[in-house]
Amino acid sequence: MFAMNALTVISTDLLTPLGAYLRLREGGRASFLLESVEKGRLGRHSFVGCGSRLVSFAEAETCGQPVVGYLGYEHAARLEPTVPVPEEGRDLPESRFVVAEMLVRFDHALGMAEVLCGDPDTVAGLLEGPQPSPAPASRARSGSTRRLPSRHEYERAVVKAKEHIRAGDAFQIVLSQRAERPTSASALELYRSLRRVNPSPYLFRSSSTGWHWSARRRRRSSRPRGVTPR
């Protein structure tokens, strides 16, 4: 359990993590929202923050401040040079992290939040200000879905993975397939929809000028064995 410092505590009975995120991202700041779900209900803690500096993974490791961001699949080749990196990508940075200048931890059990980074009075002033109104939800227009690799290529990779496992070359292989679909919906609309329909225990939303990441991550599982429910 986290101990709270009374000098940095903010009452959150009228404030949600998403509302705090909308306030902190004003002014063009790079921002992030980390949430979790436990047994179908919002988890105990949520984290909201923002910053004006974006750094790579190498810089994030040495900056000495809290960071939130991502590592692309291409980073695996740095950890294991024998791993091939797909040639076709999204022309995205291999890594990108927001250095948190303001960081707030919500405790939903206590109905309170604590300022972990930034001046408490400045952060409290932002959170107590008017909430920016998100764009009204609309009937989004979507195009056709493109999947990479194709179904045939993906199924062929599954067969190859099984061969490696049977041969003892590996005990776990994670295959992925990227789905792309053009849409008129905003990144925030997509995140709010994912929060409602996707049964995942981990949620995150991050954005900066020209960049948006929204995701819910499922738990990994394995084939059921015996009579134990999975």
Named regions from a protein language model:
Residues 1-230:
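Extended alpha-helical targeting/anchoring segments
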